[in-house]
């Protein structure tokens, strides 16, 4: 009996510790923001598929500013082969942005590559020395346990990772009938810098703020955390407040009269998100060999026809025709 009681107590103690640890981790995620959780944590939590029916990648919901992203993908690849998908995220050198605490910080970058079904991140034992060198310091994750064809990277220091190499393994339709040879689409997204909107819909301090009310600014208060409160009075004597996060640069001052919609701050954003689509052909070796044989056959046939024609011309010339 004592033994059973001890076993039950020990089990309950372990369960309680596990629950407390889980709660601690959960609160840590929300109360202690970390750069590595900034992307793509929210997209993974909110969206089963990162690409909407319209074709828009959901990262653009928070990173509303647009900037170009480029990608290099082979035109065709063989089955069960490793190839590189290179995502380029260009921006000006030494560019800095406003961090969540209002301080200036270097830009970070991130990328997502949505591969066709069957394509996935190549296992490390199949990486070449060149790929190992090009991916040093880069950590790859898949969007979910079930979607190994969607690969994510970031956030990473932008000054060192303006070009991100994704090592990809193609499927082999000869071994798995679920996949076929043919042409497929690859969807690529690349981002530099923080988002302008939080997943909750609220603006981040990396955004332009406008007045929600008209009136005269009576005072501007600055809190300990750097956030600011703009106090206004309108012509009817009503009082309003505008709350601004830390790090914003004001365009207004005490005593100014502003209209609803007027700019209160400068637009601090220097980053942006971009996406594009690429095509790739999963090539069958048998088809390639068959095509080569076909072209050789056609070429030989043409040569034989030319030789035959010359032979006929010689015979006709000899007979005086």
Swiss-Prot record:
**Record-level GO cellular component terms:** plasma membrane-derived thylakoid membrane
Ligand binding (heme):
39, 59, 62-63
In the record, biological process GO terms are: photosynthesis
Q: How is the cofactor bound?
A: Binds 1 heme group covalently.
Looking up InterPro entries in the UniProt record yields: Cyt-f_TM (IPR024058), Cyt_f (IPR002325), Cyt_f_lg_dom (IPR024094), Cyt_f_lg_dom_sf (IPR036826), Rudment_hybrid_motif (IPR011054)
Where exactly are the transmembrane stretches of this chain? 288-308
**Gene Ontology molecular-function annotations:** electron transfer activity; heme binding; iron ion binding
Query: Transmembrane helix: is it a keyword of this entry?
Result: yes
| Cell compartment(s), UniProt | Cellular thylakoid membrane
Q: How does it sit in the membrane?
A: Single-pass membrane protein
UniProt keywords, alphabetically? Electron transport, Heme, Iron, Membrane, Metal-binding, Photosynthesis, Signal, Thylakoid, Transmembrane, Transmembrane helix, Transport
Would the keyword Cytoplasm be found if you checked this record's keyword annotation?
A: no
Regarding protein family, the annotation reads: Belongs to the cytochrome f family.
- Role this protein plays: Component of the cytochrome b6-f complex, which mediates electron transfer between photosystem II (PSII) and photosystem I (PSI), cyclic electron flow around PSI, and state transitions.
What is its quaternary makeup?
The 4 large subunits of the cytochrome b6-f complex are cytochrome b6, subunit IV (17 kDa polypeptide, PetD), cytochrome f and the Rieske protein, while the 4 small subunits are PetG, PetL, PetM and PetN. The complex functions as a dimer.
Q: What is this protein called?
A: Cytochrome f
Protein species of origin: Prochlorococcus marinus (strain NATL2A)
């Amino acid at each position: 009996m004592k033994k059973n009681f001890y076993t039950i107590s020990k089990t309950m103690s372990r369960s309680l510790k596990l629950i407390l640890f889980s709660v601690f981790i959960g609160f840590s995620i929300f109360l202690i923001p970390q750069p590595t959780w900034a992307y793509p944590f929210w997209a993974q939590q909110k969206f089963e598929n990162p690409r909407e029916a319209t074709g828009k990648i959901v990262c653009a919901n928070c990173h509303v500013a647009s900037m170009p992203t480029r990608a290099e993908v082979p035109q065709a690849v063989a089955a069960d082969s490793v190839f590189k998908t290179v995502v380029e995220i260009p921006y000006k050198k030494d560019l800095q942005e406003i961090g969540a605490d209002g301080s200036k910080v270097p830009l970070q970058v991130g990328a997502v590559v949505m591969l066709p079904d069957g394509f996935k991140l190549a296992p490390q034992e199949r990486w070449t020395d060149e790929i190992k060198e090009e991916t040093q310091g880069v950590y790859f994750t898949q969007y979910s346990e079930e979607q190994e064809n969607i690969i994510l990277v970031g956030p990473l220091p932008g000054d060192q990772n303006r070009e991100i190499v994704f090592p990809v393994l193609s499927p082999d339709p000869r071994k798995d009938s679920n996949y076929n040879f043919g042409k497929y689409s690859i969807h690529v997204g690349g981002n530099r810098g923080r988002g302008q909107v939080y997943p909750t819909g609220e603006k981040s301090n990396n955004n332009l703020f406008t007045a929600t009310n008209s009136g005269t600014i009576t005072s501007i208060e600055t809190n300990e955390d750097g956030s600011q409160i703009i106090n206004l009075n309108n012509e009817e004597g009503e009082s309003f407040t505008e709350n601004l996060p830390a790090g914003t640069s004001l365009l207004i001052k005490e005593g100014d009269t502003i209209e609803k919609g007027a700019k209160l701050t400068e637009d601090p954003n220097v980053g942006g998100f971009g996406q594009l689509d690429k095509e790739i052909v999963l090539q069958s070796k048998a088809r390639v060999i068959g095509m080569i044989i076909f072209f050789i056959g056609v070429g030989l046939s043409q040569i034989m026809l030319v030789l035959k024609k010359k032979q006929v011309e010689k015979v006709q010339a000899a007979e005086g025709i």
